[in-house]
Amino acid sequence: MTETQSLELAKALISRPSVTPDDRDCQKLLAERLHKIGFAAEELHFGDTKNIWLRRGTKAPVVCFAGHTDVVPTGPVEKWDSPPFEPTERDGRLYGRGAADMKTSIACFVTACERFVAEHPDHQGSIALLITSDEEGDALDGTTKVVDVLKARGELIDYCIVGEPTAVDKLGDMIKNGRRGSLSGSLTVKGKQGHIAYPHLAVNPIHTFAPALLELTQEIWDEGNEYFPPTSFQISNINGGTGATNVIPGELNVKFNFRFSTESTETGLKQRVHAILDKHGVQYDLQWSCSGQPFLTHAGKLTDVARTAIAETCGVEAELSTTGGTSDGRFIKAIAKELIELGPSNATIHQINENVRLDDIPKLSAVYERILARLLAEKAV
């Protein structure tokens, strides 16, 4: 196998306009390719979402790669320097929607599997891939549903690598070994609409909420710890008023979000918000939505193996980090003993002219192969 195979597979995937939750047969392509080296494929589709569980072997330990074939919309196509679904090599980079997030990672792991199986046909344990077409969307019928199926039948993962783009300045310089939780609130502050010249006949919800808002934004929710920064509270939207300048609004709508560390809990944060609102006499309705709990993989075998593979291939020392947004790792951690995220540069994800460095592609595949070898080869390498 030559080093161009990862690039060619990445191009084949990028050329399929799989805007979430559309898969455009990307998973079929992966299944056909991996079938040739002994992977069994199980389709687990829910609604418009396509998921596939691919596995070679029946024994532990199970090394799983998790990824998604869906991509975000392109944005204005005319602003791209080349068509977003026509993978283009230019200036030492591969351009196309999904190049970084995350079709290159998928391609690199598949080719890593091909080389590893050719070298170690009787490897220990099992290799698996969990691929969904619903990561960039609502993420309701994707990985979370597959995890439910696997959990129900007692199918666990020992080591999981999520192929999200994690590199900052150079391939391999960062490994995500955890993520913060995400808790959102949709708050409706109740008032009484009236003429702005007669405030005594109305209740201005903006005014009643203002003291509570100040306290919420100044509250220290926790101090964080050695793995996580302090929990953050951010207002994303505030809407009130009719648009007229002479009407006191009858209600105020506020949307906010917590990114919380393992030092806080979903229940605890909710209780503290309600206590602050009640303290200031705010009349309100509040709806909550938690899209993920914080999780952490402590430094151990998987992080050690990954850092060694990166050092040998890329010549850099990987930093362990929990920064950034959420990923499907938040679902998989329920059945995975150790989980990390490791992929190409995240500098252009979701942007116009999304791209990856061409010379990073064979390196990433080599990193994945070294990880497989150190975890599953017949003999330690």
From Swiss-Prot:
Active-site feature positions: 70, 135 (proton acceptor)
MF terms in GO: acetylornithine deacetylase activity; cobalt ion binding; succinyl-diaminopimelate desuccinylase activity; zinc ion binding
Keyword Ribosomal protein: no
CDD domains registered for this protein in UniProt: M20_DapE_proteobac (cd03891)
Reactions listed under catalytic activity: N-succinyl-(2S,6S)-2,6-diaminopimelate + H2O = (2S,6S)-2,6-diaminopimelate + succinate
Coiled coil feature spans: none
Entries under InterPro entries matching the protein: Bact_exopeptidase_dim_dom (IPR036264), DapE_proteobac (IPR005941), Peptidase_M20 (IPR002933), Peptidase_M20_dimer (IPR011650), Peptidase_M20A (IPR050072)
UniProt entry keywords in alphabetical sequence: Amino-acid biosynthesis, Cobalt, Diaminopimelate biosynthesis, Hydrolase, Lysine biosynthesis, Metal-binding, Zinc
Required co-factors: Zn(2+); Co(2+)
SUPFAM superfamilies, sorted: Bacterial exopeptidase dimerisation domain, Zn-dependent exopeptidases
Subunit structure: Homodimer.
Role, per record: Catalyzes the hydrolysis of N-succinyl-L,L-diaminopimelic acid (SDAP), forming succinate and LL-2,6-diaminopimelate (DAP), an intermediate involved in the bacterial biosynthesis of lysine and meso-diaminopimelic acid, an essential component of bacterial cell walls.
Protein name, as recorded: Succinyl-diaminopimelate desuccinylase
Organism from which the protein derives: Neisseria gonorrhoeae (strain ATCC 700825 / FA 1090)
